[in-house]
């Protein structure tokens, strides 16, 4: 007797992601993908920002309120701090590519469930493969543990190089703190004028 096979959301995500020949196609697939409940509670898809030909790619966990409104990753306070991190290595957003493991904001900025993360994982994996960066920077514990398949925390993995196999090549990822965990930059205080 023939068994009826019902595609699970995870199976559908894997098949859809695998079929995307380009970043534009992947974005279109995500816009039409209904296998993750977060899509229905988010304002919009937050796909990526920056240069798709960049040699360095940054990946965080999920969009926040500001990102959900603007449709771009890392645009709020964390975005300003990420911009400073990128500037510290002599680059800016036009020379980097920025995305999240989860492309939709979880309600109330809650932590995505393991199921939501697993459903979205094939899409970010395909996005990494299509961007094909030389260096992948995971921002914070959730993206590090998800993409690098480790249970070690960010305090242990931070600053260490790993290997990430895309299926076609190995990329060098490094884990670092999420910008939200960094202290805010010191307030600018002008020096008192000193007359000679």
Region locations from a protein language model:
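A polyanion-binding, active-site-adjacent surface
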Residues: 1-196
């Amino acid at each position: 007797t023939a068994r009826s096979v019902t595609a699970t959301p995870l199976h559908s995500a894997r098949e859809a992601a695998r079929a995307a020949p380009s970043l534009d196609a992947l974005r279109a697939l995500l816009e039409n993908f209904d296998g993750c409940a977060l899509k229905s509670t988010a304002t919009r898809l937050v796909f990526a920002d920056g240069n798709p030909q960049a040699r360095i790619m940054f990946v965080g966990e999920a969009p926040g309120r500001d990102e959900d409104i603007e449709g771009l990753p890392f645009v709020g306070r964390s975005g300003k701090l990420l911009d400073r991190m990128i500037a510290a290595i002599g680059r800016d957003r036009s020379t980097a590519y920025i995305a999240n493991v989860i492309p939709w904001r979880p309600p109330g900025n809650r932590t995505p469930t393991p199921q939501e993360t697993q459903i979205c994982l094939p899409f970010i994996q395909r996005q990494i493969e299509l961007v094909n960066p030389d260096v992948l920077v995971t921002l914070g514990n959730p993206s590090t543990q998800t993409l690098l398949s480790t249970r070690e925390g960010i305090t242990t993995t931070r600053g260490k190089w790993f290997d990430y196999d895309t299926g076609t090549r190995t990329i060098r990822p490094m884990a670092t703190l999420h910008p939200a965990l960094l202290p805010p930059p010191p307030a600018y205080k002008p020096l008192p004028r000193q007359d000679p």
